[in-house]
Amino acid sequence: MSVPGWTRCAPVLLLGTACASAPAHYHTLVPAVATDPARAPDSPYRTNYPVAVERVVVPAQVDRFEMVLRRDDGEVALMENELWIAPLSEEVKNALSLDIARELGSDEGYDVGRGAPAVSIRVEIGRLDSSLGRYALIEAAWQLRAVRDTRNLMLSCNTYAYERVGSGYESLVRGHQRAVASIADQISVSVRLLASGGSWVCPTPAQPPRQ
């Protein structure tokens, strides 16, 4: 190989290295296997109730693969290298389904083709904020539908979940996992009341902190 030829190639190689894109990082809201004793198979809180999360709606602004961060000045930033492994609405639905199934001892991802579940769940998220190094926030309305003693029952509730987070995207993702788990806990409380024959009421959500 001649020296002039190498001289011509070197700038091209250096330019290619300088322009290499940053690696993408993928995140999920689906938590690892729970180790909470309250979720153990022999827990008295389990109901073995067939429950299905049928639909989860997320604001269009954040229902995407890219993570969307909220700034202090009201601006938002689209993080092209910090990605959810699936669109955010699917991530929330999968995480909710898993958390509720673990709480109640029901089948994970109940197949509605097997017949109507005892309780169907629909969730509409009105606000989902991600503030790096500060908080993860979810405001949502959820609706339960069930049949008991030939009666059609419906319960509509509002919920709020706020989790402080540390620095880094991993901490932010864990904060959202805790927020989703908090909503799943509230839904599970109402399902347990129905299963026990009690009054079907909305649980009392935590009060929003002052930001």
Describe the predicted segments one by one.
Residues 1-17:
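Sec-dependent bacterial lipoprotein signal peptides
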Residues 54-56, 70-72, 143, 147, ...:
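Generic beta-structure capping elements
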Residues 174-211:
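Compositionally biased, intrinsically disordered linkers/stalks adjacent to structured regions
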Residues 19-88, 196-211:
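A structural "domain/chain start" motif
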Residues 20-38, 44-47, 98, 102-150, ...:
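Surface-exposed short loop/turn segments
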Residues 75-83, 149-189:
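Short secondary-structure boundary motifs at beta->alpha junctions and helix caps
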Residues 89, 93, 97, 101, ...:
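Extracytoplasmic/secreted envelope proteins and their assembly/folding machinery
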